[in-house]
């Protein structure tokens, strides 16, 4: 599949994910938010779940934004018509979850702060849409300035 086009609902859904990222930042955590939606560009998207990184808040090293969102979605028989919106490019663990659940489309707010594994996902048939969203970049910059030690402990130290 590779890289795809932005549809009319992508920015609206990304705004919800960004709200999740801001909630994490205000709680002293890593500002990565995610939402899972079902539907299509022609029929519109319906929100299934939202979540944000809670690695710091819960002391849980695997509570990344995407994982928290998927956990909040609960059990589903299929992810075939879903899109995962994430404010930052997914790491290897989150990319693995995307592949495991066969989520066909991922919309990424920004990949400048952390490139993640977008090529890995695209090579395996996941449609990637990169929004290059200024709000997503800004929340990561604010986090890096406010919590430099936490940033270096997380993906900033790699």
Where are these regions (language model features)?
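A structural microfeature
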Residues: 48-51
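A short acidic/small-residue loop/turn micro-motif
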Residues: 54-57
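Conserved beta-strand segments that form the floor/walls of ligand-binding pockets within enzyme
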Residues: 31, 83-87, 107
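Short beta-strand scaffold segments in enzyme catalytic cores
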Residues: 31-46
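Small-residue (primarily alanine) positions within well-ordered alpha-helices
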Residues: 17, 21-24, 34, 65, ...
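Alpha-helix exit/C-cap motif
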Residues: 26-29
């Amino acid at each position: 599949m590779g890289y795809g086009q932005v549809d009319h609902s992508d920015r609206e859904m990304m705004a919800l994910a960004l709200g999740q990222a801001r909630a994490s930042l205000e709680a002293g955590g890593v500002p990565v938010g995610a939402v899972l939606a079902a539907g299509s560009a022609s029929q519109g998207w319906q929100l299934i779940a939202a979540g944000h990184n809670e690695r710091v808040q819960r002391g849980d090293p695997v509570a990344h934004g995407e994982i928290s969102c998927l956990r909040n979605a609960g059990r589903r028989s299929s992810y075939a018509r879903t899109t995962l919106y994430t404010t930052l490019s997914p790491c290897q663990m989150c990319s693995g979850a995307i592949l495991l659940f066969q989520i066909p489309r991922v919309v990424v707010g920004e990949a400048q702060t952390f490139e993640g594994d977008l090529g890995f996902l695209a090579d395996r048939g996941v449609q990637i849409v990169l929004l290059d969203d200024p709000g997503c970049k800004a929340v990561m910059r604010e986090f890096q300035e406010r919590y430099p030690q936490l940033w270096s402990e997380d993906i900033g130290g790699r």
